[in-house]
Design a protein with these regions (language model features):
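Bacterial N-terminal signal peptides
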Residues: 18-30
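Boundary at the C-terminal end of the N-terminal hydrophobic targeting segment
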Residues: 33-35
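Acidic, glycine-rich flexible loop segments
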Residues: 128-165
Protein backbone atom coordinates (compact mmCIF):
# COMPACT_ATOMS: atom_id res chain seq x y z
CA UNK A 1 0.00 0.00 0.00
CA UNK A 2 1.31 3.45 -0.91
CA UNK A 3 2.08 5.66 2.08
CA UNK A 4 -0.32 8.57 2.58
CA UNK A 5 1.86 11.65 2.02
CA UNK A 6 -1.01 14.07 1.79
CA UNK A 7 -0.89 17.30 3.74
CA UNK A 8 -2.88 17.50 6.99
CA UNK A 9 -6.56 18.03 6.46
CA UNK A 10 -8.28 21.25 7.43
CA UNK A 11 -9.48 19.64 10.67
CA UNK A 12 -5.96 18.71 11.65
CA UNK A 13 -4.69 22.17 10.86
CA UNK A 14 -7.44 23.68 13.00
CA UNK A 15 -6.54 21.37 15.92
CA UNK A 16 -2.87 22.29 15.63
CA UNK A 17 -3.72 25.98 15.47
CA UNK A 18 -6.01 25.67 18.50
CA UNK A 19 -3.29 23.93 20.53
CA UNK A 20 -0.78 26.63 19.61
CA UNK A 21 -3.22 29.37 20.61
CA UNK A 22 -3.95 27.66 23.93
CA UNK A 23 -0.23 27.39 24.69
CA UNK A 24 0.30 31.05 23.83
CA UNK A 25 -2.64 32.09 26.02
CA UNK A 26 -1.30 30.06 28.95
CA UNK A 27 2.12 31.68 28.59
CA UNK A 28 0.49 35.10 28.44
CA UNK A 29 -1.54 34.47 31.60
CA UNK A 30 1.52 33.21 33.48
CA UNK A 31 3.51 36.25 32.38
CA UNK A 32 0.70 38.57 33.47
CA UNK A 33 0.51 36.89 36.88
CA UNK A 34 4.24 37.20 37.39
CA UNK A 35 4.16 40.83 36.33
CA UNK A 36 1.35 41.55 38.81
CA UNK A 37 3.30 40.05 41.72
CA UNK A 38 5.36 42.59 43.64
CA UNK A 39 9.10 42.39 43.33
CA UNK A 40 11.21 42.63 46.47
CA UNK A 41 10.27 45.73 48.48
CA UNK A 42 13.19 47.22 50.42
CA UNK A 43 12.85 49.91 53.10
CA UNK A 44 15.61 51.58 55.11
CA UNK A 45 15.54 53.27 58.50
CA UNK A 46 17.89 55.66 60.26
CA UNK A 47 20.43 54.09 62.57
CA UNK A 48 20.19 55.28 66.17
CA UNK A 49 16.57 56.49 66.09
CA UNK A 50 15.88 54.17 69.04
CA UNK A 51 18.19 52.83 71.72
CA UNK A 52 18.97 49.18 72.32
CA UNK A 53 19.66 46.10 70.22
CA UNK A 54 16.42 46.17 68.23
CA UNK A 55 17.27 49.27 66.19
CA UNK A 56 16.01 48.46 62.69
CA UNK A 57 18.11 49.71 59.78
CA UNK A 58 16.72 47.82 56.77
CA UNK A 59 13.78 45.53 56.00
CA UNK A 60 12.66 43.72 52.88
CA UNK A 61 9.63 41.70 51.80
CA UNK A 62 9.47 39.26 48.92
CA UNK A 63 7.78 36.11 47.70
CA UNK A 64 10.27 33.24 47.93
CA UNK A 65 10.68 30.60 45.23
CA UNK A 66 8.65 28.11 47.30
CA UNK A 67 5.71 30.54 47.50
CA UNK A 68 6.25 31.53 51.11
CA UNK A 69 6.63 35.15 52.16
CA UNK A 70 10.16 36.12 53.14
CA UNK A 71 10.78 39.09 55.43
CA UNK A 72 14.39 40.06 56.16
CA UNK A 73 14.97 42.37 59.13
CA UNK A 74 18.38 44.00 59.68
CA UNK A 75 19.48 45.66 62.92
CA UNK A 76 22.21 48.10 63.92
CA UNK A 77 23.84 45.59 66.28
CA UNK A 78 24.25 41.84 66.50
CA UNK A 79 21.20 40.03 67.78
CA UNK A 80 20.85 36.95 69.98
CA UNK A 81 17.75 35.23 71.36
CA UNK A 82 18.84 36.27 74.84
CA UNK A 83 18.61 39.93 73.81
CA UNK A 84 14.84 39.49 73.36
CA UNK A 85 14.22 38.14 76.85
CA UNK A 86 13.12 40.48 79.63
CA UNK A 87 13.87 40.21 83.33
CA UNK A 88 10.58 42.03 83.91
CA UNK A 89 7.80 43.31 81.69
CA UNK A 90 7.01 42.16 78.15
CA UNK A 91 9.61 40.29 76.08
CA UNK A 92 11.24 41.88 73.08
CA UNK A 93 9.95 41.12 69.61
CA UNK A 94 10.23 42.02 65.96
CA UNK A 95 6.99 41.73 63.98
CA UNK A 96 5.64 42.16 60.48
CA UNK A 97 2.32 43.95 60.96
CA UNK A 98 -0.06 42.84 58.19
CA UNK A 99 -3.38 44.32 57.01
CA UNK A 100 -5.15 41.92 54.64
CA UNK A 101 -8.49 43.73 54.19
CA UNK A 102 -8.73 45.71 50.96
CA UNK A 103 -10.05 48.83 52.69
CA UNK A 104 -7.80 48.71 55.75
CA UNK A 105 -6.25 51.98 56.93
CA UNK A 106 -2.95 51.23 58.72
CA UNK A 107 -2.87 54.74 60.18
CA UNK A 108 -6.07 54.15 62.17
CA UNK A 109 -6.60 50.36 62.29
CA UNK A 110 -4.83 47.52 64.02
CA UNK A 111 -3.33 44.86 61.75
CA UNK A 112 -5.28 41.62 61.50
CA UNK A 113 -2.14 39.46 61.28
CA UNK A 114 1.29 39.53 62.91
CA UNK A 115 4.32 37.50 61.85
CA UNK A 116 6.74 37.75 64.77
CA UNK A 117 10.14 36.74 66.04
CA UNK A 118 10.48 36.27 69.80
CA UNK A 119 12.80 34.14 71.96
CA UNK A 120 12.02 30.66 73.23
CA UNK A 121 15.16 30.58 75.37
CA UNK A 122 18.61 32.16 75.71
CA UNK A 123 19.79 30.41 72.56
CA UNK A 124 16.68 29.79 70.45
CA UNK A 125 14.41 32.12 68.48
CA UNK A 126 10.71 31.43 68.01
CA UNK A 127 8.68 32.45 64.98
CA UNK A 128 4.92 32.54 64.64
CA UNK A 129 1.94 34.01 62.83
CA UNK A 130 -0.83 35.50 64.97
CA UNK A 131 -4.40 36.65 64.37
CA UNK A 132 -5.54 39.96 65.84
CA UNK A 133 -9.31 40.07 66.32
CA UNK A 134 -9.93 42.37 69.26
CA UNK A 135 -8.42 44.13 72.25
CA UNK A 136 -7.11 40.88 73.77
CA UNK A 137 -3.86 39.08 73.10
CA UNK A 138 -3.25 37.91 69.53
CA UNK A 139 -4.07 34.26 68.80
CA UNK A 140 -1.22 32.12 67.54
CA UNK A 141 -2.19 30.45 64.25
CA UNK A 142 0.96 28.65 63.16
CA UNK A 143 4.72 28.72 63.26
CA UNK A 144 7.15 30.60 61.04
CA UNK A 145 10.74 29.72 60.27
CA UNK A 146 13.44 32.00 61.68
CA UNK A 147 17.06 32.14 60.54
CA UNK A 148 19.83 34.37 61.85
CA UNK A 149 22.29 35.32 59.11
CA UNK A 150 26.05 34.80 59.40
CA UNK A 151 26.56 38.45 60.34
CA UNK A 152 24.13 38.01 63.27
CA UNK A 153 22.65 41.41 62.44
CA UNK A 154 19.77 40.15 60.26
CA UNK A 155 16.88 37.77 60.78
CA UNK A 156 15.00 36.07 57.94
CA UNK A 157 11.39 35.20 58.74
CA UNK A 158 9.43 32.91 56.39
CA UNK A 159 5.71 32.19 56.60
CA UNK A 160 3.05 30.76 54.30
CA UNK A 161 0.47 32.70 52.33
CA UNK A 162 -2.26 30.51 53.84
CA UNK A 163 -1.30 31.71 57.33
CA UNK A 164 -2.47 35.20 56.39
CA UNK A 165 -5.55 34.05 54.44
CA UNK A 166 -4.09 34.09 50.91
CA UNK A 167 -5.07 37.69 50.08
CA UNK A 168 -4.48 39.08 46.60
CA UNK A 169 -2.53 41.87 48.23
CA UNK A 170 -1.73 43.09 51.71
CA UNK A 171 -0.22 46.09 53.44
CA UNK A 172 2.66 45.71 55.86
CA UNK A 173 4.95 47.53 58.24
CA UNK A 174 7.70 46.30 60.57
CA UNK A 175 7.86 46.97 64.30
CA UNK A 176 10.47 46.02 66.90
CA UNK A 177 9.94 46.43 70.65
CA UNK A 178 12.72 46.48 73.22
CA UNK A 179 12.28 43.90 76.01
CA UNK A 180 10.82 45.14 79.28
CA UNK A 181 9.61 48.42 77.80
CA UNK A 182 6.28 49.55 76.34
CA UNK A 183 7.01 53.26 75.90
CA UNK A 184 6.89 54.65 72.33
CA UNK A 185 10.60 55.47 72.58
CA UNK A 186 11.29 51.71 72.86
CA UNK A 187 9.49 50.88 69.61
CA UNK A 188 11.09 51.18 66.17
CA UNK A 189 8.85 51.17 63.09
CA UNK A 190 9.55 50.90 59.38
CA UNK A 191 8.19 52.82 57.56
CA UNK A 192 7.93 55.68 60.05
CA UNK A 193 4.80 57.67 60.83
CA UNK A 194 2.22 54.88 60.89
CA UNK A 195 2.41 54.27 57.15
CA UNK A 196 2.60 50.92 55.35
CA UNK A 197 3.60 49.48 51.99
CA UNK A 198 1.48 47.35 49.66
CA UNK A 199 2.65 43.92 48.50
CA UNK A 200 0.81 42.18 45.65
CA UNK A 201 0.63 38.39 45.60
CA UNK A 202 -1.46 37.94 42.46
Amino acid sequence: MRADLRRPTGGRRRLALGAACAAALTALLVSAALAATSKTIVLTDARGDVSGTLDLTRVSMQRASDGRLRAALSFADKLTPKALLATSGPPGSACVRIWTAAGADPASMRPDRLACVTARSDDEFRGGVYEVTGPGLPKRLTGASVKLTASATSIVLRFTQSSIGRPQRFRFAIESTRPGCERPACIDTVPDGGTARTFRLR
